[in-house]
Amino acid sequence: MSYTLDSLGNPSAYRRVTETRSSFSRVSGSPSSGFRSQSWSRGSPSTVSSSYKRSALAPRLAYSSAMLSSAESSLDFSQSSSLLNGGSGGDYKLSRSNEKEQLQGLNDRFAGYIEKVHYLEQQNKEIEAEIQALRQKQASHAQLGDAYDQEIRELRATLEMVNHEKAQVQLDSDHLEEDIHRLKERFEEEARLRDDTEAAIRALRKDIEESSMVKVELDKKVQSLQDEVAFLRSNHEEEVADLLAQIQASHITVERKDYLKTDISTALKEIRSQLECHSDQNMHQAEEWFKCRYAKLTEAAEQNKEAIRSAKEEIAEYRRQLQSKSIELESVRGTKESLERQLSDIEERHNHDLSSYQDTIQQLENELRGTKWEMARHLREYQDLLNVKMALDIEIAAYRKLLEGEETRFSTFSGSITGPLYTHRQPSVTISSKIQKTKVEAPKLKVQHKFVEEIIEETKVEDEKSEMEETLTAIAEELAASAKEEKEEAEEKEEEPEAEKSPVKSPEAKEEEEEGEKEEEEEGQEEEEEEDEGVKSDQAEEGGSEKEGSSEKDEGEQEEEEGETEAEGEGEEAEAKEEKKIEGKVEEVAVKEEIKVEKPEKAKSPMPKSPVEEVKPKPEAKAGKGEQKEEEKVEEEKKEVTKESPKEEKVEKKEEKPKDVADKKKAESPVKEKAVEEVITISKSVKVSLEKDTKEEKPQPQEKVKEKAEEEGGSEEEGSDRSPQESKKEDIAINGEVEGKEEEEQETQEKGSGREEEKGVVTNGLDVSPAEEKKGEDSSDDKVVVTKKVEKITSEGGDGATKYITKSVTVTQKVEEHEETFEEKLVSTKKVEKVTSHAIVKEVTQGD
């Protein structure tokens, strides 16, 4: 089987193909020219005729035909080059005849080659037909496969040859495109040159017009000068005529006078000679004046010509400069366009990068939000686990105390209790009544929020950190002192109805209540530590949610929380004492609820607290009073309770240390103040009449509270036992609040006073926002607005410059309290757990 390309095998078709294709040939030289040159020539229809066959001679014949066409084109070029380079007419004719003979010989040889090729192709066809017949007769399947492979190889060879031809054509087309591009550039350059020449022609035409105008002006000047010369000549002639007339008149008179004389001729001769002398002199003078005037006019004309020539040269120079500047302007415009394109590209890239960065920022914010929610969830789970742990610890401690109470009851006589005064406290009936009240009333949440807005305006940042530390410490101490005084007043009012409602019980009931009070003390201690942990965990969550840069502080706070949780499990005795404290707080909550139930009709509209000095005296005096009260309470607790855990001592030390540190910081960082303006606005809204009464009354010392408690419970020992224990609980609660505030203040000082802080606090696993808390019906709002302005003027001695620093610190405190009550059944007694959380939000705004 044979696969022939009939379309390419036809010589006429191939001629048509070769006519449309131009071949590029490089000629080394010619007989008449000794240089290398390139030429573009098109092959004639009779130059190349080849066929694409399966025979082996086809590529060789095609190559020979291409060589012949290149030789013919080289001969054509040599002919043209000899014509261009020149020579004698005989040489040109001789070379032309030689070239014709060579072309005829080559054409004859090429025709012979073509005939031979046709003959060989015919023979190849016959031989291939015979071979194919033999193959069809004798070939097996394997032989057919070999034949097919051979055919495929041959077809691939032909395909490669066709691809080679195609590549050659593509190369030629590329060369043609390059030539076209080069010709286009040349055409553009020629057009540019034409424009330049046309511009030069227009400039020359303008010069010609200007020169013609100058010529006309000069002609006018020449005409005017000629008119002036004619006028002068006429004047001169008139003067000469006048002189001649005068001479003739004088001659006539002389003739009349000398009429009688005989010697007239001599006199006339003399007169004529004199007249001629005068006329000659006048003529010479007139000619000299004319020549002088003409010379002056010619000099003026030459000067004008020089000025015109210099002006023309300047004009030409200016035109050349204008052309150069126009060229520079075009180049600058090109650079401007390129720079604008680059700028647009850069802006597009910048916008793209900005959009991508915004997408990444949005993604990171979403991830951060997710991590915050995850963190809050983990914190809620942690709080739930802590609550479960605390409940289990309370149960364990209750069972332990029940067992210990049974042992002590069997060991000692029920009526004779001769221990220390404050080791075993007398029971009180108020527990049962309180529990009944908590059954009826709905649980109340009390959350305290503080909004601190600091607006700082200063022209120069100087000693900013120390000043802000002082102001923040003073504000925190004032708020702590005010909250402390309010709680003391509330506790004093609560102690009175508790003492009134305490009847006498049987010895067995007293023993049971002693055990319950011990459990309450243990629960109070545990609740205090849990509140400290909640404050620290809230602060850690606030720092992590608002500022990513404070991750190290969060880790430190988490380590503190872990340390506190480990410390909680150190000893069972400490847990028992904490349970007792929690039960004591349960009693306080129940007393408050009883008072609210008994006196609902006394609720009045909220009244503002009039005395400003009670809320904000000097910070140092407040701090000193708070420390003295804390020390007195600590001493009384040591007298009352013999078995005190080391944890409580550590808590008290922690409470005292931050205030001492704040006082030291105040002493170390003094600030020179020129003018200090303090504006304090306090507005408080209270819904219960009991709280209004506590606000109207001034804070009483702690000793009076103790005396009242002792007088009310004078006949019974439980009253005297109860008042110091309640004061102890109050002290712990207040100290816990102060400690949380001081720790928060230290964190804000470490983060820097100039930065904006907005902290959201998660309390007991609930993310409570201020907007949601304001919607609560039973929530009481306390607002303390403190505005402090500090103006500072410092002068530098060297430069004589004066710095004016103005600071305005506005602190807004909003206190909202919510109470959570939980009920548990334990051996026919009910325990109520009170969790008071303080959520503190600070908004700090600094303006320079």
Curated annotation (Swiss-Prot):
Residue ranges, annotated region (Tail): 411-848
Compartments reported by the entry: Cytoplasm, Cytoskeleton; Cell projection, Axon
Composition-biased stretches (Low complexity): 21-44
Modified residues (N-acetylserine): S2
BP-aspect Gene Ontology terms: axo-dendritic transport; intermediate filament bundle assembly; intermediate filament cytoskeleton organization; microtubule cytoskeleton organization; neurofilament cytoskeleton organization; regulation of axon diameter
Region (Coil 2A): 264-285
InterPro entries (UniProt xref): IF_conserved, IF_rod_dom, Intermed_filament_DNA-bd, Intermediate_filament, Keratin_I
Positions with biased composition (Polar residues): 1-10
Modified residues (Omega-N-methylarginine): R42
UniProt keyword list: Acetylation, Cell projection, Coiled coil, Cytoplasm, Cytoskeleton, Glycoprotein, Intermediate filament, Methylation, Phosphoprotein
Disulfide-linked positions: none
Domain IF rod: 99-410
Gene Ontology molecular-function annotations: structural molecule activity
Residues of this chain annotated as glycosylated in UniProt: T47, T430
Region (Disordered): 1-51, 482-785
Residue segments, region Coil 1B: 148-246
Region (Linker 1): 135-147
SMART domains, sorted: Filament (SM01391)
Biased composition (Acidic residues): 488-498, 510-533, 554-576
Record's GO cellular component terms: axon; myelin sheath; neurofilament; neuromuscular junction; neuron projection; postsynaptic density; postsynaptic intermediate filament cytoskeleton; presynaptic intermediate filament cytoskeleton
Main localization (coarse): cytoplasm
Region: Head, residue numbers: 2-102
Similarity annotation: Belongs to the intermediate filament family.
Subunit structure: Forms heterodimers with NEFL; which can further hetero-oligomerize (in vitro). Forms heterodimers with INA (in vitro).
Function of the molecule: Neurofilaments usually contain three intermediate filament proteins: NEFL, NEFM, and NEFH which are involved in the maintenance of neuronal caliber. May additionally cooperate with the neuronal intermediate filament proteins PRPH and INA to form neuronal filamentous networks.
Record's protein name: Neurofilament medium polypeptide
